[in-house]
């Protein structure tokens, strides 16, 4: 069993920068020992240890559970007794922990519940429910927090019978004690209105009760809650207007009190009921509209109220979507009141916003551009305004234009003093001008009552070039206007703007140069149309500015090189670099060695403490772009300059970088005639089991292993470890696709004389998986694999491959799985490979015809049905939109594919077009085979086909 003192020592060292890596490695070595998880829990529970050590333990435990609780098939990885003891101890432990530790253990419990609840954790519900009481609110808070950490999993899930059964199971146990506790807490708040300590814990409990109320109702409104809607919503209505000075700190302006959090959660719940359950909630909606109005018109603009304002506005937005409630607002008087009392106060720039701009510029940008963990007032107001405008564009536009004219007049009267009025003017014009949603591709439709290009010329362009701008935020507003309406400006206008934006990369103003970088990147990603992969900007368009753009962008990053965290803080700069590289393509090859050296320097600095997954991603994308556009004869030089750093990444086990490094090395090997000498030493370590344990590694290491096999399979003198990797992948539902990808390379690229001793075992593994735990995807990939083998190794080989396991087994597999699955394959490349491989069995398979003649007619039915299908589903384009990478927010949670060096799918039949070429090939092949048979084949087979397929065959053969 792991020693508690040793584990505590390593955890204490893990929070010190100089010892963090070593201690992490030591803990990883210990985690394989029996009882390690329990030891971690005991460390977390030890009140005599420093809180920092316990928190480090809670974080490590959370990640340990994510890594080690179950495999990809849901089987426990820990010993059974460890599993049971952890589940027994973790609930009472979490209940007793302080808030910051509860959060981490709550996530661990949620992970455990994902795999084990309810079937493998049947005692959980009764254990939780039995701990609830009317008097011990501290315990109640802990119990409810545990429950919420489990039940919040339901919120994003798709409806299913299994999910509803789980929810019903919980409701049957929880609803009665839950509602009783809600009423008790309400009563005790009233009874303790002058007792600050009691009020604080009671409101803590009330907050979690509201979150659970949402959990219980997130999928559908249960009958119990429908029956008790007056009770529950009556209590919540009461607390939206509740005030008590004991719950507020007048000196606190930034952080929301528990009372504000309670009101915000109520508004979130009320929005759910308005959106989803208006049929039962309708009679109460007007009461909540009134109280929300009172709230919004009475609370101050202090940041601590931002979350409440945002949630309240989101509720009003949901109300506005319902026509009968919109009519409350659909008149000039009401709309003026909304404008003056709600929208304008909440979109006007505050001193706190200006301070954020100056003191924490990257956070200002994230809030402005993306929103943040707590939604901004401006974002919520914009959503509300957009909904009002969609319902009555003329009324809303005219009312706001009248107010906006006044803002312009105030600004012009004293620009240096009244610059915020111009900021407000630009913000409101932008919000009014946009129709529909802003997608990653930008604005696609604008308000016909407004002219965005004319506004740009008159109001925006001067602020781009003026040397006497009243406040730098107006410069940012001007740049952001280009960013927002880039699709409405012509290419000629954008080309004129590019040098201006480029000059902003030389300023010291953080937000200015960052927005300039963002806007340059977005301009370079404008496509010729929404469905086109082609960009409007090409390398010729930026040839005169590419070098200076890259130089300035890289300089902005490296000026923070003293700190790995600060260096990697601003992913927008690196993303812009990547886009410039992608656009310039091969036009700056002489710069590649110098650029690569700078990126390697950045990687080396980041490696000390990887902190920003997006910055990391775009850094490696940029390296990939350079390699992709490098002439093949120059690759070895660049590889030699990278490999020392990459080998350090491996030796120091920098897991945040490893999947990227594997992809880059794989690309280099794919492009090389021989495996570079600096890469050869990786071949054997690549086969080590620990390399394949981290889920995020698997696609990349599979690609690298395939590239070794493709370029020089003799680098693996012993095939057993390679086949062991295949066995591991093919057994997994999560990685079966990678297993088939690897097997294709093994079967087609390794000399058959070397492979022959293992052929039968490969077939056994495939068939065992088919028998024991097949999935729809597995059977489809097996069908494609059969097609590939038939095409490349021959129909006779395929039959012997299966029948060597058991004579006659081929008939069962072919008839029950392959030909029934073929018509269901949607991916066009897979369909082509499988269809032509199956056809090959008929027209080139003498052994097939002699041994399995009864399969011919059913095989032909499958071929005709597939070849006649009009489906063109799911063939991926050659490009991947970079905006799809926005989800990258954490390291190691999933594989992050590098777009710049993406692997092309293997096509064994490139001469046959995946669309019309397949039908044409099938028709020609059948006609040719029929002619060789003396016109007997089709005459013989036609009566054996279904009537529908007889018609389809005739149409196919004549080219219809």
Curated annotation (Swiss-Prot):
It comes from the Eukaryota. A motif (Nuclear localization signal) lies at residues 366-381. The keyword Cytoplasm applies. GO terms for molecular function: nuclear export signal receptor activity; small GTPase binding. Keywords: Cell cycle, Cell division, Cytoplasm, Mitosis, Nucleus, Protein transport, Repeat, Transport. GO terms for cellular component: cytosol; nuclear envelope; protein-containing complex. It is found in: Cytoplasm; Nucleus. InterPro entries: ARM-like, ARM-type_fold, Importin-beta_N, XPO2_C, XPO2_central. Residues 23-96 form the Importin N-terminal domain. HEAT repeats lie at residues 1-33, 34-73, 74-120, 121-157, 158-220, 221-278, 279-323, 324-392, 393-445, 446-489, 490-528, 529-586, 587-630, 631-674, 675-716, 717-751, 752-794, 795-826, 827-928, 929-960. The keyword Repeat applies. GO terms for biological process: cell division; positive regulation of protein export from nucleus; protein export from nucleus; protein import into nucleus; snRNA import into nucleus. Pfam families: CAS_CSE1, Cse1, IBN_N. Belongs to the XPO2/CSE1 family. Present with 23500 molecules/cell in log phase SD medium. Export receptor for importin alpha (SRP1). Mediates importin-alpha re-export from the nucleus to the cytoplasm after import substrates have been released into the nucleoplasm. Binds with high affinity to SRP1 only in the presence of RanGTP. The complex is dissociated by the RanGTP-binding protein YRB1. This is Importin alpha re-exporter. The gene is CSE1.
């Amino acid at each position: 069993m792991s020693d508690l003192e040793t584990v505590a020592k390593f955890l204490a060292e893990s929070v010190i920068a100089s010892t963090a890596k070593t201690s992490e490695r030591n803990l990883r070595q210990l985690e394989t020992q029996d009882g390690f998880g329990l030891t971690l829990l005991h460390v977390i529970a030890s009140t005599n240890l420093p809180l920092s050590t316990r928190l480090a333990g809670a974080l490590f435990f959370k990640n340990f559970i994510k890594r080690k609780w179950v495999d990809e098939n849901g089987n426990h990885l820990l010993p059974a007794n460890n599993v049971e003891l952890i589940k027994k101890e973790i609930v009472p432990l979490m209940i007793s922990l302080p808030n910051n530790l509860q959060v981490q253990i709550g996530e661990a419990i949620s992970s455990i519940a994902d795999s084990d609840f309810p079937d493998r954790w049947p005692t959980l519900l009764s254990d939780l429910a039995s701990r609830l009481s009317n008097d011990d609110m501290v315990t109640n808070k802990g119990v409810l927090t545990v429950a919420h950490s489990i039940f919040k999993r339901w919120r994003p899930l798709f409806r299913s019978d299994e999910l509803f059964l789980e929810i019903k199971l919980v409701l049957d146990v929880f609803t009665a004690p839950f509602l009783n506790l809600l009423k008790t807490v309400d009563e005790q708040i009233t009874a303790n209105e002058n007792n600050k300590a009691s009020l604080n814990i009671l409101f803590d409990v009330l907050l979690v009760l509201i979150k659970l109320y949402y959990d219980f109702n997130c999928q559908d409104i249960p009958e119990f809650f429908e029956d008790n809607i007056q009770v529950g919503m009556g209590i919540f209505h009461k607390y939206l207007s509740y005030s008590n000075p004991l719950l507020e700190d007048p000196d606190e302006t930034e952080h929301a009190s528990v009372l504000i959090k309670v009101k915000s959660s109520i508004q979130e719940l009320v929005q759910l009921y308005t959106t989803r359950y208006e049929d039962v909630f309708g009679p109460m909606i007007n009461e909540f509209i009134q109280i929300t109005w009172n709230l919004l018109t009475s609370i101050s603009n202090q940041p601590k109220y931002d979350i409440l304002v945002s949630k309240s506005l989101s509720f009003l937005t949901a109300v506005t979507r319902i026509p009968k409630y919109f009519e409350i607002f659909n008149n000039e008087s009401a709309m003026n009141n909304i404008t003056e009392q709600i929208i304008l106060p909440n979109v006007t720039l505050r001193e706190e916003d200006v301070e954020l701009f100056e003191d924490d510029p990257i956070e200002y940008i994230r809030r402005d551009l993306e929103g943040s963990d707590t939604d901004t007032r401006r974002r919520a107001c914009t959503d509300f305004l957009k909904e009002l405008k969609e319902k009555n564009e003329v009324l809303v536009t005219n009312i706001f234009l009248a107010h906006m004219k006044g803002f312009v007049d105030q600004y012009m009267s004293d620009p240096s003093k009244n610059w915020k009025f111009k900021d407000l003017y630009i913000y409101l014009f932008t919000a009014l001008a946009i129709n529909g949603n802003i997608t990653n591709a930008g604005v696609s439709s604008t308000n016909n009552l407004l002219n965005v290009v004319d506004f740009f010329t008159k109001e925006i362009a001067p602020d781009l070039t003026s040397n006497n701008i009243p406040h730098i935020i107006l410069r940012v507003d001007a740049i952001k206007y280009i960013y927002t309406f880039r699709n409405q400006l012509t290419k000629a206008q954008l080309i004129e703007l590019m040098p201006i934006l480029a000059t902003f990369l030389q300023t010291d103003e953080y937000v200015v140069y960052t927005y300039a970088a963002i806007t340059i990147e977005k301009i370079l990603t404008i496509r010729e149309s929404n469905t086109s992969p082609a960009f409007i900007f090409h390398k010729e368009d930026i040839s005169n500015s590419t070098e200076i753009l890259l130089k300035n962008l890289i300089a902005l990053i490296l000026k923070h090189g003293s700190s790995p965290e600060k260096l990697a803080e601003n992913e927008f700069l690196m993303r812009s670099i990547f886009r410039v590289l992608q656009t310039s393509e091969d036009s700056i090859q002489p710069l590649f060695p110098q650029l690569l050296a700078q990126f390697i320097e950045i990687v080396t600095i980041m490696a000390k403490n990887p902190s920003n997954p997006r910055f990391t991603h775009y850094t490696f994308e940029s390296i990939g772009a350079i390699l992709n556009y490098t002439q093949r004869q120059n690759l070895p030089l660049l590889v030699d300059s990278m490999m020392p750093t990459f080998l350090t990444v491996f030796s120091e086990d920098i897991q945040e970088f490893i999947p990227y490094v594997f992809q880059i090395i794989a690309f280099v090997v794919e492009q090389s005639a021989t495996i570079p000498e600096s890469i050869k030493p990786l071949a054997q370590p690549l086969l080590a089991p620990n390399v394949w344990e981290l889920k995020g590694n698997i696609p990349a290491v599979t690609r690298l292993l395939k590239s070794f096999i493709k370029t020089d399979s003799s680098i693996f003198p012993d095939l057993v470890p390679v086949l062991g990797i295949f066995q591991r992948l093919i057994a997994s539902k999560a990685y079966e696709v990678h297993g088939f990808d690897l097997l294709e390379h093994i079967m087609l690229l390794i000399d058959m004389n070397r492979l022959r001793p293992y052929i039968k075992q490969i077939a056994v593994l495939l068939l065992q998986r088919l028998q024991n735990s097949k999935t729809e995807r597995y059977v489809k990939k097996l069908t494609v694999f059969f097609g590939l083998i038939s095409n490349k190794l021959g129909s006779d080989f395929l039959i012997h491959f299966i029948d060597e396991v058991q004579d006659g087994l081929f008939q069962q597999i072919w008839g029950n799985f392959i030909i029934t699955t073929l018509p269901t394959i949607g991916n066009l490349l897979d369909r082509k490979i499988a269809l032509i491989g199956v056809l090959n069995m008929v027209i080139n398979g003498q052994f097939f015809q002699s041994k399995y003649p009864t399969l011919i007619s059913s095989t032909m039915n499958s071929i005709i049905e597939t070849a006649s299908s009009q489906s063109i589903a799911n063939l991926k384009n050659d490009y991947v939109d970079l905006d799809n990478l926005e989800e990258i927010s954490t390291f190691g949670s999933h594989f992050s594919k590098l777009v710049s060096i993406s692997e092309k799918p293997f096509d064994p039949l490139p001469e046959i077009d995946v669309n019309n070429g397949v039908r044409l090939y099938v028709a020609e092949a059948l006609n040719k085979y029929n002619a060789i048979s003396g016109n007997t084949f089709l005459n013989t087979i036609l009566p054996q086909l279904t009537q529908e397929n007889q018609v389809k065959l005739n149409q196919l053969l004549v080219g219809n």
